[in-house]
């Protein structure tokens, strides 16, 4: 092994510096999913899959929001629709966002009806998470042949 290469061995696994980075990241992700109510996100994704399976793609976001609300209500999930999120700067209001659905005051849902989930969609969800103070969110895209979803957590 070259002198400048650093390696660590744990049990039978050997990690170089890059491997250690990924192990630490994996541990952070595990903590995130333990802190977030994973059951709620699983239930929401299941409801979204049922809506997409029955309706298919091609409708407006509002139609999917209405259908998902019906399905969440049937499953007994506590949620709010079209929640206004105020953005402040030095105590002064500077704008607001409208979140599609907030589930159980811990998970923000952003519904899309696009070809695929893009970078601006992810940025929008992160901005909503900052404005709301919620720890995690889901982008649910009903616009493709199969339901796309992306879990995201507030990093700051």
Please name every model-derived segment.
Residues 75-88:
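A short acidic/basic microdomain associated with nuclease active sites
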Residues 56, 79, 99-117, 128:
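Conserved catalytic cores of phosphodiester-cleaving nucleases, focusing on short active-site segments
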Residues 37-45, 57-61, 65, 69:
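Nuclease catalytic cores
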Residues 112-156:
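Nucleic-acid nuclease catalytic cores
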Residues 1-34:
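Short, low-complexity, charge-dense intrinsically disordered segments
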